[in-house]
């Protein structure tokens, strides 16, 4: 049982690492589309690419954010005394809250994604992509990175 609890304490670090890495991947890969040297081609192809690509990568979001929430909550309820004694409880709570805060950007993100998919502004969709990239980077720095750091602190304290 102790081994399972130790694993449970570490799992939010793993799942939030995946989320943070995905955000970084998005920034690096999607950022290619706004480079001046390919802007003309990007404006022609980005809406179709994004629409089809979104169907392929959305599973990462559908799986890993709820996993973060579930693991954060499970950690708060299993062996609570140990978490209180070590001070890890507040770090799991903060990690969970930062992870949930990612969703505060949901409507903004969906609006920008719709603009990309609908080629808005017409013929200059890279403008919308640039706005999405800025929002995504801000969101990663303000929610995903702190969640990851909090889950690391929690695991270090709990173990």
Curated annotation (Swiss-Prot):
Membrane topology summary: Multi-pass membrane protein
Sugar-modified residues: 124, 136
Signal peptide: 1-25
Residue stretches spanning the membrane: 59-79, 96-116, 139-159
Biological pathway: Mycotoxin biosynthesis
Keywords annotated in UniProt: Glycoprotein, Membrane, Oxidoreductase, Signal, Transmembrane, Transmembrane helix, Virulence
EC number from the UniProt entry: 1.14.-.-
Annotated organism of origin: Mollisia scopiformis
Superkingdom of the organism of origin: Eukaryota
Annotated Gene Ontology cellular component terms: membrane
Role, per record: Probable epoxidase; part of the gene scp cluster that mediates the biosynthesis of a hirsutellone-like compound that has still to be identified.
Compartments it resides in: Membrane
Keyword Oxidoreductase included in the entry's annotation: yes
Family: Belongs to the epoxidase xenD family.
Protein name: Probable epoxidase scpX
EC category: oxidoreductase
GO molecular function: oxidoreductase activity
Gene: scpX
């Amino acid at each position: 049982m102790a081994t399972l609890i130790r694993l449970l304490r570490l799992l939010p670090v793993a799942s939030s690492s995946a989320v943070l890495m995905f955000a970084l991947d998005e920034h690096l890969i999607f950022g290619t589309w706004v480079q001046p040297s390919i802007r003309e081609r990007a404006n022609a192809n980005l809406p179709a690419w994004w629409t089809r690509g979104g169907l392929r990568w959305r599973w990462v979001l559908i799986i890993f954010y709820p996993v973060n929430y579930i693991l954060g909550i499970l950690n708060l309820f299993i062996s609570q005394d140990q978490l209180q004694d070590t001070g890890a409880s507040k770090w799991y709570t903060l990690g969970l809250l930062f992870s949930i805060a990612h969703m505060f950007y949901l409507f903004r993100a969906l609006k920008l994604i719709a603009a990309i998919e609908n080629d808005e502004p017409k013929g200059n969709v890279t403008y919308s992509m640039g706005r999405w990239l800025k929002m995504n980077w801000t969101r990663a720095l303000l929610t995903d990175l702190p969640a990851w750091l909090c889950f690391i602190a929690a695991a270090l304290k709990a173990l």
